[in-house]
């Protein structure tokens, strides 16, 4: 009897974890077929965000910490959304930094400038000047924001993904092309990461 009781005590946390999150309330199953696959079988977490979103800024550092803790257990990708006219420039800024292998440097700087310093960077010229101030050649920066089919294609691809997954609020996350959640569904930053952990395990 005692052994059975001990066994039940060990099972209880797992059972509680399994029933803690409710489909349709805390997360949604992606109804349509996936558009991409992760070839190395590592769970793929796609964050939909914008530098223009204050909540995206608030969770950016915790999200980076979470991704670091996950290590090889998950792969984080970011997709900038375009909900407002100037967010198109923010999407171009993200892909420009990524193309130049400057994402780790530029992401926090762009977030801080727009969210804390209240510098909207709402024109092509202001974005070009901003990138130049942080070490990018002016002609390269100008080309990225004014005439880059590659950058434009990546922005459009991101918008297609946004529509595909029916993203209407950010920050939002798609886990392994199977499940979707966002900060609004989670209700808090702490709970959001708990849900992401749960969905990573569930999708494996």
UniProtKB/Swiss-Prot annotation:
<dbReference type="InterPro" id="IPR017937">
    <property type="entry name" value="Thioredoxin_CS"/>
</dbReference>
<dbReference type="InterPro" id="IPR001853">
    <property type="entry name" value="DSBA-like_thioredoxin_dom"/>
</dbReference>
<dbReference type="InterPro" id="IPR036249">
    <property type="entry name" value="Thioredoxin-like_sf"/>
</dbReference>
<dbReference type="InterPro" id="IPR023205">
    <property type="entry name" value="DsbA/DsbL"/>
</dbReference>
<keyword id="KW-0732">Signal</keyword>
<dbReference type="Pfam" id="PF01323">
    <property type="entry name" value="DSBA"/>
</dbReference>
<dbReference type="InterPro" id="IPR050824">
    <property type="entry name" value="Thiol_disulfide_DsbA"/>
</dbReference>
<comment type="function">
    <text>Involved in disulfide-bond formation. Acts by transferring its disulfide bond to other proteins.</text>
</comment>
<dbReference type="GO" id="GO:0015036">
    <property type="term" value="F:disulfide oxidoreductase activity"/>
</dbReference>
<dbReference type="GO" id="GO:0042597">
    <property type="term" value="C:periplasmic space"/>
</dbReference>
<protein>
    <recommendedName>
        <fullName>Thiol:disulfide interchange protein DsbA</fullName>
    </recommendedName>
</protein>
<feature type="domain" description="Thioredoxin">
    <location>
        <begin position="19"/>
        <end position="146"/>
    </location>
</feature>
<keyword id="KW-0574">Periplasm</keyword>
<dbReference type="InterPro" id="IPR013766">
    <property type="entry name" value="Thioredoxin_domain"/>
</dbReference>
<feature type="disulfide bond" description="Redox-active">
    <location>
        <begin position="53"/>
        <end position="56"/>
    </location>
</feature>
<feature type="signal peptide">
    <location>
        <begin position="1"/>
        <end position="18"/>
    </location>
</feature>
<keyword id="KW-0676">Redox-active center</keyword>
<keyword id="KW-1015">Disulfide bond</keyword>
<comment type="similarity">
    <text>Belongs to the thioredoxin family. DsbA subfamily.</text>
</comment>
């Amino acid at each position: 009897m005692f052994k059975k009781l001990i066994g039940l005590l060990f099972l209880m946390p797992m059972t509680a974890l399994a029933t803690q999150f409710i489909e349709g309330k805390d997360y949604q199953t992606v109804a349509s077929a996936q558009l991409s696959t992760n070839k190395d079988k590592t769970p793929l977490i796609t964050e939909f965000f914008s530098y223009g979103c204050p909540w995206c800024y608030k969770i950016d550092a915790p999200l980076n910490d979470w991704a670091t803790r996950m290590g090889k257990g998950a792969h984080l990708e970011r997709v900038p959304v375009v909900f407002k006219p100037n967010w198109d420039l923010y999407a171009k800024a993200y892909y420009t930094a990524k193309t130049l292998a400057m994402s780790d440097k530029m992401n926090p700087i762009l977030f801080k400038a727009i969210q804390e310093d209240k510098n909207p960077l709402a024109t092509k010229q202001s974005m070009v000047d901003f990138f130049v101030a942080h070490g990018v050649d002016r002609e390269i920066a100008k080309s990225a924001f004014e005439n880059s089919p590659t950058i434009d294609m990546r922005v459009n691809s991101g918008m297609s993904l946004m529509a595909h997954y029916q993203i209407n609020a950010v920050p939002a996350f798609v886990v392994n092309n199977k499940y979707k959640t966002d900060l609004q569904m989670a209700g808090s930053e702490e709970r959001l990461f708990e849900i992401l952990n749960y969905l990573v395990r569930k999708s494996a």
